[in-house]
Amino acid sequence: MLAIEVKNLTKNFNGLKAVNSISFKVKEGEIFGLLGPNGAGKTTTVKILTTLLKPTKGKANVWGYDILTQRDEVRNSIGIVFQEPALDNRLTGYENLDFHARLYGLNKTKREERIKEVLNLVELQDKAKVLVKNYSGGMQRRLEIARGLMHYPKVLFLDEPTLGLDTQTRRHIWDYILKLNQKEGTTIILTTHYMEEADFLCQRTAIIDFGKIIVNDTPFNLKNILGGDVLSIEAEPVKEAFSVFQEFPWVKKVSRHNGFIDLNVEQGEKKIPLLMKIDQKEKGFEIKSVNLRKPTLEDVFLHFTGKTIREREASQSEKNKMVMQRRFKR
C-alpha cells in the first residue's frame, strides 16, 4: 500500500515557486527523506501534505485520503513534529502528552496506556512529571516525537527533527526514530538538510532544490551513481591544479568547493601515487593534502546541482532577498 502519493504538486507565493510540480510516492512502513538546503521547499511540502497549506496546483493522497476533499481523515491519520518547538513549557511531559491525547478523543484508560508506551519508546519515563522548561533540547525533541505518536498515526511527519542539536544528541534522536519505525511500523516522512541524517535513516531519499525534486532513490543507489572513490585534494593555487586534474583520462569528474578539489575516480588508492608523480613545480601548483573516501550524499547533491548544500543555501537566501526587493519596488 502507498502511504503517500504526490502528483505534480505546486505552491506559489507571490511569484515565488516554493514547490515546483513535484511527484513522489511513499510506501507503507517506509522512512522517506526530503533532503535539501533551507528554502528548497521541504517544509512547504510538509505543510501541504498535512493540510496546513493548500497547493496552487497538483494532487496528493495521504493514507488514501485526498488532502483537499478529505482533510479531517488526513489529519486523523497523521502525526506532526514541527520544526519550531510546540510544547507548553509550563506543563510536565506527562501533561503535554495527556492534553494532546484529549484533543484526539482518547479515553482516560487509553490515554494512560499510550502515554506510558510512548514515554518508554523515547526513554523519558523517568522525566514524565518534570516541567518541560527543565528539559534539555534533546529531551524536548524526544517528547515532541512521543506527542506526535499519541493517537497512533499511520504517517508521522518530522520536519528537521534534529535541527540545532549537538552531534551526540542528534544521533540519539536517530536511534529513537529507527526504533519507532521498527517497533510501531510507522511510516515516516523526514525533512532534513543534514546529508548524514538522510543517509543513516532513510530507505529512500528525494533531493529537492529550488522547489524541484532533482533525483529520488535509495541512498545507496544515489551514491552509486557516482561510483568508485573520491579523492579530496587541497592544492594551491586551486585554479592551476583544477586545470591539470581535468586533463587526466582516469578522472571521471572534477569539482571544487570550499577550497578543495574533488576527483571522482575508480580504485582511488591506486591513483594517489599518480598524483604524487606530477611535477607540481612545473605545473605551477602544490598539493597540500589528499584524502581518499567513498562518495557521500553531499557529492550526489554537488553532482546534480553544481554546488554544495551550504553554497545552495546561501544562493537561495540571496534569490529570496532579490524577489522581496523587486516586490517592494512595485
Model-inferred region functions:
Residues L131-Y135:
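Conserved ABC ATPase signature
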Residues V230-T308:
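Short, charged/small-residue-rich alpha-helical element at the C-terminal edge
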Residues L156-D159:
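Catalytic Walker B motif of ABC-type/P-loop ATPase nucleotide-binding domains
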Residues Y152:
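Conserved catalytic motifs of ABC-family nucleotide-binding domains
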